[in-house]
C-alpha cells in the first residue's frame, strides 16, 4: 500500500499538467481514507515534493494538499502544525528562499496558494487558531495584498518600484539629452529645409497652392483643373462683350470668349492669386489703347474665331526634366534631401520617442512632431516632382572635357627630316648593312646565343660565391695546374668520368642557413645570452646564461621548398555506400579515411572492377564472422519479448548509450533559452576558442620575453 501511495504521488506531482488526473486522484483519496497512518505518510510525501526545486512539482503537490485539506481534519492538523514552512514553500514569504523556476509555474503557485489560504481562513479560521494567526501574519506583517492579482510580496513590490524609478530616471536623462540636441540642431534643420524649399521654387517657379496650409504638389493639378471652366471677369471679356460688334460675333463659339485666359494657360499652370493682377493690367491697357479684333487675334496667334481650343492638364502630376540649366539646383536639392533622410529625420524620430517615453516634455514633443512632418513633407515633394534624368547630356559633356584635357597633354613634335623607320631589304646593301637572314635561322641563332649567355652568367655567378662548389672546383684546378703546367693531360678513368657526369646532372641547390649547421647537434646560433646584472639591488636570484629560442632553432633545422609543379584538383569522389543508403561525397586524392583506398564505383556504390568487388565481399564475411549470431538485434528482441528481460537490443544498434530523462513531462530547467547572449556565450566560451586565445596570449608573452630578456622586469619572471 505504501509503495502504491508513493507511486501515485510521484506520478501526480511529476506529470507537468495544470490539472490533476481525476482517476489517480480518486485512488489517492481512497488510500488516504483507509487509515490515519496512510494519511500521515501522504502528508510527509507531499511536504517532500513541496521542497523540490521545480515549481511545476510544487504546484501539483499544492493542488493535492488543497484537495486533502478541505476533506480531512487530521490532514488539517498536520498542515497547521507546520504552517510557516508551508507558506515559505508555496508563497515564498522568505526572501532568502524564493520560489524555484520556471517563472510562470511559480506565479501560478503563488496565486493559487494565496486564494487557498484566504478561503481556508474564511472556512476554518475560527476552529484552527494557527491558521488565523498565519493569515494575520501574511496580511499585516508581510504586507501581502490578497486582492492583488499578481500576488506580490513587499520585497517584490519594492524591487519593481525601484526598477520603475530607475527606468524613469533613464528616460528623463535621455529626454534632457534630446532637448539639448534639439536646441543645437534646430537652426541647422531649418536652414536645410529653407534650402530645399528654395530649390523647389527654382525648379517649379509657380505657386501651386491657394492657401499656405496645403503644401502638396498633387493638389495643384486638381485646383488648376477646377479653375479651367470658370468664367472670366468683365475686364478680360472678348471684344464682343466689351461692346465691339463684328460680322463674326454670331459664329463665335462660347469658348472663344476665354481666349485670353486660355492662351495664358497653354503649356503651364497658373495660380489663382495671379489672375486679378493680370486682369487689372489688361483692363488698364484696354482703357489706354483702342481694342481691335484683328489685333487681338494676331497678338494671340489666332487666325479666326471659327475653331475651339482645348487645354488638357496632365493628371499624372508634374515631371521635371533634368538638363544643364537646372543641374546645379538639382544637385543642391539632392544633397540637402540626402542629409535629411540619413541624418535629420532619424534624429528627429529618436527625439519623438524619447519625449514620449519621458512624458513631461509636451512642448518639445509637439515641436519635434512638427519638425518631423516638415522633413517628411520635403521628401514627399521631391518624390512628386518626378525628376527625369537627362539623357546622356552629363556623360557627353564630361567625355568631351576629358578628351580635351588628354589632347592638351600631348606635345606635337615635327618629324625628323630624312628619317626612315624601316629600311627595305633591297636597299640594305646600299646603306652598308648585311642582307637580312631568314626568319627561322634568325630565331634559332638568337635562342642559342641567349642560352649560351645565360649559362656563362650562371657559371660566373657561382664562381664568384666562395661557398659554392664551382668556386671550390676552380680553386682546385688552379692548384693542380700551377705546379706542372707542362705535364701531359691524363685521361680520367671510367669511375671518375661517371662521377663527373653525375655532378653535371646534379641539381644546384642554393646555400642556406640549414646547410651551414647541417649535422650539428649543439648549435651556437639561436641562443639568447644573458649578462649578469651589475646592479646592487635589482639582481635575480638565478640567472640562466643561455636561453634557447625555439623559433630560431626551428629555422636552422628546416627549409621551405616551394612546390614548382602545377596543382591538379581532385575530380573523383569516394562514392562508397554509407549505412544510411547514401554515397560518400569525400574528394580525397588516394585514400578515404572512412572507406579506404578510392576505387571506381557505379551509381549504387558497388565496385566496377571484379577484383575490388571480391575483396569487399571477403571483408564483409570477415566482419560477420567476428560478430556472434546471438548478438543480432532482431534475435535479441525476440528473446526479450519471450522472457521479459532487457538484453540491450535497443542499445545495440546505436553508437551512444544516451541518457533517458527521468521526468520527460516537466520543463527542463537545464535547457537554456535561445537568446543572443546564450548564442554568443556558446561561441566565445567554447573550448576550442578559449584554447586559441590562451595560445595566442602565451605566444605574445613569449615574444616579449625574448625581445626584452635583458630587462629586469622579465628577468625576474
Curated annotation (Swiss-Prot):
Localization: Chromosome
Residues with Phosphoserine modification: 284, 291, 403
UniProt-annotated binding residues for Zn(2+): 574, 584, 592, 595
Biased composition range(s): Polar residues: 479-489
Role this protein plays: Factor involved in transcription-coupled nucleotide excision repair (TC-NER), a mechanism that rapidly removes RNA polymerase II-blocking lesions from the transcribed strand of active genes. Acts as a key adapter that promotes recruitment of factors involved in TC-NER. Facilitates the ubiquitination of the elongating form of RNA polymerase II (RNA pol IIo) at DNA damage sites, thereby promoting RNA pol IIo backtracking and access by the TC-NER machinery to lesion sites.
Zinc finger (UVSSA-type): 571-598
Biased composition (Acidic residues): 285-294, 400-412
Gene from which the chain derives: Uvssa
Biased composition regions of type Basic residues, renumbered to the chain: 652-664
Biased composition (Basic and acidic residues): 599-618
GO molecular-function term, one example from the UniProt record: RNA polymerase inhibitor activity
Swiss-Prot/TrEMBL keywords: Chromosome, Coiled coil, DNA damage, DNA repair, Isopeptide bond, Metal-binding, Phosphoprotein, Ubl conjugation, Zinc, Zinc-finger
Region (VHS-like): 2-145
Pfam families (UniProt xref): DUF2043, UVSSA_N
One cellular component term from this protein's GO annotations in UniProt: nucleus
Name of the protein in question: UV-stimulated scaffold protein A
Crosslinked residue numbers (Glycyl lysine isopeptide (Lys-Gly) (interchain with G-Cter in ubiquitin)): 416
Coiled-coil stretches noted in the UniProt entry, renumbered to this chain: 169-199
An example Gene Ontology biological process: protein ubiquitination
Positions of region (Disordered): 231-253, 277-301, 389-418, 479-503, 595-672
PANTHER family reported in the protein's UniProt record: UV-STIMULATED SCAFFOLD PROTEIN A (PTHR28670:SF1)
Assembly, per entry: Interacts with the elongating form of RNA polymerase II (RNA pol IIo) during transcription stress. Interacts with the TFIIH complex during transcription stress. Interacts with ERCC6. Interacts with ERCC8. Interacts with USP7.
PTM annotation, UniProt: Monoubiquitinated at Lys-416 in response to transcription stress; this promotes efficient transfer of TFIIH to stalled RNA polymerase II.
Record-stated family: Belongs to the UVSSA family.
Amino acid at each position: 500500500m505504501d509503495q502504491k501511495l508513493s507511486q501515485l504521488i510521484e506520478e501526480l506531482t511529476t506529470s507537468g499538467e495544470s490539472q490533476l488526473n481525476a482517476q489517480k486522484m480518486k485512488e489517492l483519496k481512497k488510500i488516504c481514507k483507509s487509515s490515519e497512518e496512510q494519511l500521515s505518510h501522504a502528508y510527509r510525501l507531499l511536504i517532500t515534493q513541496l521542497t523540490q526545486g521545480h515549481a511545476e512539482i510544487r504546484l501539483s503537490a499544492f493542488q493535492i494538499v488543497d484537495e486533502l485539506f478541505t476533506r480531512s481534519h487530521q490532514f488539517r492538523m498536520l498542515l497547521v502544525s507546520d504552517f510557516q514552512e508551508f507558506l515559505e514553500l508555496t508563497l515564498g514569504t522568505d526572501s532568502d528562499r524564493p520560489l524555484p523556476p520556471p517563472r510562470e509555474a511559480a506565479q501560478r503557485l503563488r496565486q493559487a496558494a494565496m486564494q487557498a489560504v484566504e478561503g481556508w481562513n474564511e472556512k476554518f479560521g475560527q476552529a484552527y487558531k494557527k491558521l488565523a494567526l498565519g493569515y494575520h501574519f501574511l496580511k499585516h506583517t508581510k504586507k501581502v495584498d490578497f486582492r492583488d492579482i499578481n500576488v506580490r510580496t513587499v520585497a517584490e513590490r519594492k524591487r519593481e518600484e525601484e526598477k520603475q524609478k530607475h527606468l524613469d530616471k533613464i528616460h528623463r536623462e535621455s529626454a534632457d539629452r534630446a532637448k539639448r540636441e534639439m536646441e543645437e540642431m534646430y537652426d541647422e534643420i531649418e536652414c536645410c529645409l529653407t534650402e530645399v524649399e528654395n530649390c523647389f521654387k527654382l525648379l517649379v517657379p509657380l505657386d501651386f497652392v491657394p492657401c499656405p496650409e496645403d503644401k502638396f504638389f498633387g493638389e495643384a493639378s486638381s485646383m488648376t483643373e477646377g479653375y479651367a471652366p470658370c468664367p472670366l471677369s468683365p475686364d478680360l471679356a472678348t471684344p464682343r462683350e466689351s461692346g465691339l460688334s463684328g460680322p463674326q460675333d454670331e459664329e463665335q463659339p462660347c469658348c472663344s470668349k476665354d481666349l485670353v485666359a486660355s492662351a495664358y494657360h497653354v503649356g503651364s499652370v497658373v495660380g489663382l492669386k495671379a489672375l486679378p493682377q493680370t486682369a487689372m493690367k489688361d483692363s488698364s491697357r484696354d482703357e489706354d489703347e483702342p481694342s481691335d479684333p484683328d489685333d487681338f487675334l494676331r497678338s494671340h496667334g489666332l487666325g479666326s474665331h471659327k475653331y475651339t481650343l482645348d487645354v488638357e492638364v496632365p493628371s499624372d502630376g508634374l515631371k521635371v526634366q533634368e538638363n544643364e540649366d537646372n543641374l546645379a539646383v538639382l544637385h543642391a536639392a539632392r544633397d540637402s534631401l540626402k542629409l535629411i533622410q540619413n541624418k535629420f529625420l532619424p534624429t528627429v524620430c529618436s527625439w519623438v520617442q524619447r519625449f514620449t517615453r519621458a512624458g513631461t516634455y509636451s512642448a518639445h514633443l509637439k515641436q519635434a512632431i512638427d519638425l518631423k512632418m516638415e522633413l517628411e513633407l520635403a521628401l514627399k515633394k521631391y518624390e512628386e516632382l518626378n525628376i527625369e534624368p537627362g539623357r546622356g547630356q552629363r556623360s557627353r559633356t564630361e567625355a568631351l572635357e576629358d578628351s580635351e584635357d588628354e589632347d592638351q597633354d600631348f606635345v606635337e613634335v615635327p618629324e625628323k627630316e630624312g628619317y626612315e623607320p624601316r629600311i627595305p631589304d633591297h636597299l640594305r646593301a646600299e646603306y652598308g648593312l648585311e642582307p637580312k637572314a631568314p626568319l627561322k635561322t634568325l630565331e634559332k641563332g638568337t635562342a642559342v646565343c641567349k642560352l649560351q649567355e645565360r649559362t656563362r652568367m650562371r657559371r660566373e655567378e657561382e664562381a664568384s660565391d666562395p661557398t659554392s662548389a664551382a668556386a671550390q672546383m676552380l680553386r682546385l684546378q688552379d692548384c693542380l695546374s700551377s705546379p706542372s703546367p707542362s705535364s701531359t693531360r691524363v685521361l680520367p678513368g671510367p669511375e671518375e668520368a661517371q662521377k663527373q657526369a653525375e655532378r653535371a646532372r646534379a641539381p644546384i641547390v642554393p646555400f642556406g642557413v640549414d646547410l651551414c649547421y647541417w649535422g650539428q647537434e649543439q648549435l651556437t646560433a639561436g641562443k639568447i645570452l644573458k649578462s649578469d646584472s651589475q646592479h646592487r639591488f635589482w639582481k635575480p636570484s638565478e640567472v640562466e646564461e643561455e636561453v634557447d629560442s625555439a623559433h630560431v632553432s626551428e629555422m636552422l633545422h628546416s627549409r621551405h621548398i616551394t612546390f614548382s609543379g602545377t596543382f591538379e584538383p581532385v575530380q573523383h569522389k569516394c562514392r562508397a555506400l554509407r549505412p544510411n543508403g547514401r554515397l560518400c561525397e569525400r574528394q580525397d586524392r588516394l585514400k578515404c579515411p572512412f572507406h579506404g583506398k578510392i576505387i571506381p564505383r557505379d551509381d549504387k556504390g558497388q565496385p566496377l572492377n571484379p577484383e575490388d568487388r571480391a575483396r569487399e565481399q571477403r571483408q564483409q564475411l570477415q566482419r560477420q564472422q567476428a560478430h556472434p549470431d546471438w548478438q543480432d538485434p532482431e534475435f535479441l528482441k525476440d528473446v526479450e519479448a519471450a522472457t521479459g528481460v532487457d538484453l540491450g537490443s535497443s542499445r545495440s544498434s546505436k553508437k551512444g548509450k544516451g541518457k533517458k530523462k527521468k521526468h520527460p513531462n516537466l520543463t527542463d530547467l537545464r535547457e537554456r533559452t535561445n537568446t543572443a547572449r546564450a548564442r554568443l556565450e556558446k561561441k566565445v566560451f567554447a573550448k576550442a576558442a578559449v584554447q586559441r586565445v590562451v595560445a595566442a596570449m602565451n605566444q605574445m608573452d613569449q615574444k616579449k620575453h625574448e625581445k626584452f630578456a635583458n630587462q629586469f622586469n622579465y628577468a625576474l619572471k
